[in-house]
A protein has these predicted regions:
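Bacterial N-terminal signal peptides
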Residues: 1-8
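Catalytic and substrate-binding clefts that recognize carbohydrates or anionic sugar/phosphate headgroups
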Residues: 14-173
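Signal peptide processing junction and immediate N-terminal pro/mature segment
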Residues: 9-13
Length: 173
């Protein structure tokens, strides 16, 4: 059933299938796209490679969808209506990131005016979502490539200039 659920989502999402969906921690799911190669996108976020600890819960609803545009890897995740989104690193503006577009690339910005302050000294390919009922989830896009993080009210998008990458979704009570 889970495999069919993921196939439906990837077929709808675009041209990159999800190769592997694995429970790697307590309510932590790893999504690996077809074509992922650790030598092209080594992890700078993980201390060690995760290992499967069990089956993905049947009621899992936060599903990464992968696409590729002109050879550049992308991932997106639909989020429940009314979700508040936070993250992306050091950027100017409000902490609430809904409706924001953040460039993720670490360089010395020099002035807050460059790129509208959308990238200062640290970028984090991480989003924290808080649902209207107060429950929360997190999404880690495990890529070091130059990227853009778009946090719409119904979807999180992560568009890179590089190779396919893994995503991790943490959804705990």
């Amino acid at each position: 059933l889970i495999a069919m659920l993921f196939e439906v989502h990837t077929a709808f999402a675009g041209d990159v299938k999800t190769e592997k969906v694995t429970l790697v921690g307590t309510r932590i799911v790893e999504f690996v796209p077809e074509g992922y190669d650790a030598s092209r996108t080594p992890s700078l976020m993980l201390v060690r490679e995760p290992k499967k600890i069990g089956e993905v819960p049947l009621n899992w609803t936060l599903i990464s969808q992968f696409t590729s545009v002109d050879g550049k890897a992308n991932a997106s995740l639909n989020v429940p209506a009314g979700t508040s989104l936070y993250g992306g690193g050091e950027v100017t503006g409000p902490l609430l990131r809904n409706g924001q577009k953040i460039k993720l690339w670490n360089t010395d910005n020099g002035m807050y005016r460059v790129d509208g302050g959308s990238r200062l000294y640290q970028t984090h390919p991480w989003v924290l979502g808080v649902r209207p009922d107060g429950t929360a989830f997190g999404v880690l896009f495990d890529s070091f490539w130059k990227a853009e993080l778009i946090t719409n009210s119904d979807k999180i998008e992560f568009n890179t200039e590089g190779a396919p990458f893994r995503t991790y979704v943490i959804d705990r009570k």
